[in-house]
Design a protein with these regions (language model features):
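Enriched but not universal
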Residues: 1-14
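Acidic glycine-/aspartate-rich tracts in secreted/extracellular proteins
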Residues: 34-36, 177-180
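Amphipathic alpha-helical segments that form the core helices of the histone-fold
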Residues: 46-60
Length: 203
């Protein structure tokens, strides 16, 4: 077998699987959805997942690979134990339901005045954030999350209590040409609406 042929086969094998940045998230996903028991999660296995259900996420969670679950619906509730979170939501999810992201945490309770760093990236053209889409379990009054909407040019509908009663979105990144539309929409509970070109992270 030629070296180039071998490289192509290795690359093909590598590309069959989802490669998680966060090893604890990887463990959780393999435990839930590794059907063939090979200790890895293939893209084919991820594509078979529709109902994510309740997921208890680890501390300092990064779940960018959620974007690879291309058939997952919005039947999901993420429970985060702190506000050091980054998650990339796949493009087919366009309505963000009640309790989509729940910050129910000992750390938040102990550090109620500390500003959090949760980043929720929604790749779809979002239509609606429903009641308590983002929620926490106490009067956490400081800004603790940012929303990134790279493909939502028209402001979605925001339920007046989309981020619970106390949550504060410190930054909402939107398409550059839509900043003024979002500002005119008077989205409740958002401190800063910024152009996506100023977002420094990856998605």
């Amino acid at each position: 077998m030629s070296m180039n042929r071998r490289r192509l086969l290795l690359r093909h094998e590598y590309n069959k699987y989802i490669h998680f940045e966060d090893k604890e998230v990887e463990r959780i996903c393999i435990e839930k959805w590794d059907k063939d028991g090979d200790g890895k999660l293939s893209k084919e296995e991820a594509a078979q997942v529709t109902n994510i259900g309740n997921m208890q996420m680890p501390h300092n969670c990064k779940f960018r690979e959620f974007k690879d679950f291309e058939n997952a619906t919005n039947a999901v509730q993420f429970h985060f134990p702190d506000t050091n979170v980054e998650i990339v939501v796949p493009s087919q999810i366009t309505t963000i339901p009640i309790f989509f992201a729940q910050f129910v945490t000992a750390q938040i309770q102990q550090n109620n005045n500390a500003e959090g760093n949760a980043v929720l990236i929604f790749l779809g053209e979002i239509k609606e954030f429903q009641y308590y889409a983002i929620s926490d379990d106490r009067e956490y009054r400081t800004p603790y999350f940012s929303i990134v909407l790279p493909n939502t040019k028209t402001p979605p509908r925001f339920n007046p209590a989309w981020k619970a009663n106390y949550g504060i979105c410190k930054k909402m990144y939107v398409p550059d040409g839509s900043v003024e539309l979002y500002k005119a929409a008077n989205v409740p509970g958002v401190l800063n609406i910024l152009p996506i070109s100023e977002y420094k992270g990856n998605y």
